[in-house]
Amino acid sequence: MKKFARFIGIDDGYFVRNVHKKTKLIGAITKHTILDGVLSREITIDGDDVSEKIIDMIKNSNHYYQIRGIILYGITFAGFNIADVELIYKNLGLPIIIVMERPPKDIFYKAIEKYKPNGIELIKKAGPIYKTKTPFGYTYYQVYGIDKDTASNIINNLAIVSKIPEPARVAHMIARGVTKGDSSKPRAGGDSNPGPAG
């Protein structure tokens, strides 16, 4: 895959459970390190609409035919709104990489089993969790529609200032900035999940 190919990173905005019903879903399109476009939708807290919103957001964008892959910042969004990578790939035909700062803990899976009956099945669709070493530490990742070695190369090519690839890092900053007023605020708080980034 070309070094300057366009990728879209996707992350969700800040929310407080039992206060907010929806939050922003942000897609940041980068051409290597250059921000080339921003897409947005709203998703339901603990809902089931993130996959259809990702599909709609990308498919109806002028950038669709230029994008070479999707990088999700975690597989869960807006609480327990879990991305269905099989459905996304089937509709868009784009390889998917899910990146995490750390592997999920047992409490994450227990929470999924408790609050989202089909959640574990959706997570399993993304396959095993791998790790790749970047100049900033290990990045953990899952893949769909692409092999793990190619995904590792993409992550390292786009890990410019942190172990999170630039499209996902920028999407995270924009999402937090527009929903919380400050992109530098940490994930911990009302919008955090008991597991990997998402």
UniProtKB/Swiss-Prot annotation:
InterPro entries: Endo_dU. It comes from the Archaea. It holds the Pfam family DUF99. Residues 179-198 are annotated as: Disordered. HAMAP family: UPF0215 (MF_00582). Belongs to the UPF0215 family. This is UPF0215 protein NEQ431. It comes from Nanoarchaeum equitans (strain Kin4-M).
